[in-house]
Amino acid sequence: IYREANNQSIAGMIAVARVVMNRAQDRRWPAKVCDVIYEGPVYESWKTKKNPDLKDSERVYLPKKNRCQFSWYCDGKADEVINTENNIQWKVANSIAYEVLAFDRWNGIVEGANHYHADYVQPDWRKRMQLVARIDDHIFYRME
């Protein structure tokens, strides 16, 4: 939530959280939230690829840049959040995550949306979806 929507309103952050949950609750996507977030093509790190004797469990796989479901995961930038103690948006995002995960809150805010994009891009997949909401800088869609 923080990585995808920290510059959005609370409603915008909730909407992003609901997309993740809507996917986790739909058999077309993985059932675990983390698996939904990390879904996408990967490649093996050159460090482990050069060693043919490694076990599969010892190999390191990385997301292909700009090819995953949630852009922050594969943008190539560090994922560390600086100064979480004084970061209000971080605290809000964590509170929203708790409410959505623990209590399945705000279920109708994006009417079952399972896709979204920033309003400054126009991905081709949007043409095959039903537009359900516009919240802040994001446009939300439902794939039937």
Q: What kind of feature is each model-predicted range?
A:
Residues 1-144:
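Bacterial extracytoplasmic/cell-wall-associated proteins, especially those involved in peptidoglycan
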